[in-house]
Amino acid sequence: MKTAFTLIELIFAIVIMGILAVVAIPRLNATRDDAQASTAAANVSVAVMDITSYYTAKGFFTDVKSMSNIVIDDNGNMKVKNTDCFRITVSNATSSEVDPTKGISVGSPILKVVAISSSDNACLSAQRLTRSILDSSPINIGQGNVKFN
């Protein structure tokens, strides 16, 4: 009766573990990308709410970075996995941005969320998850005349 593993049995065990690793590692990476995409999509929604609330409370714009607690760089870009994925800007509407169906006239305060071209899978997934926000941009954020001092 033998009490130890043979070399063949050890080699088979190592081969099986290698096959499992080849299958499992890409799945783990995909799961991580999905989590980052979900987080980014939630952050875009929160940034839109933060900026809208800021404008409602103050009645004016500052830079986008200071109007939200979401991490946005000085250019208004949000990153997913260190890749610029979204650009958020605020401005007053120009004649080319007038949209009566959204209540946007010349000079209306608007918020724009634009997808930045990327090949990163997490970024592309985040852009798909935020499609409704991207499609509704520009967003009129000054429809009311209420100001809080």
PLM features: residue spans?
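Periplasmic/extracellular, small/polar-rich flexible segments of pilin-like filament-forming proteins
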Residues: 56-149
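Alpha-helical protein-protein interaction elements
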Residues: 20, 46-47, 140
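Generic structural signal for short, solvent-exposed loop/turn connectors between secondary structure elements
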Residues: 1-3, 34, 65, 141
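Membrane-proximal N-terminal amphipathic helix
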Residues: 35-63
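Generic intrinsically disordered, low-complexity segments enriched for polar/acidic and small residues
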Residues: 2, 9, 51-52, 83, ...
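N-terminal single-pass transmembrane signal-anchor helix
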Residues: 1-28
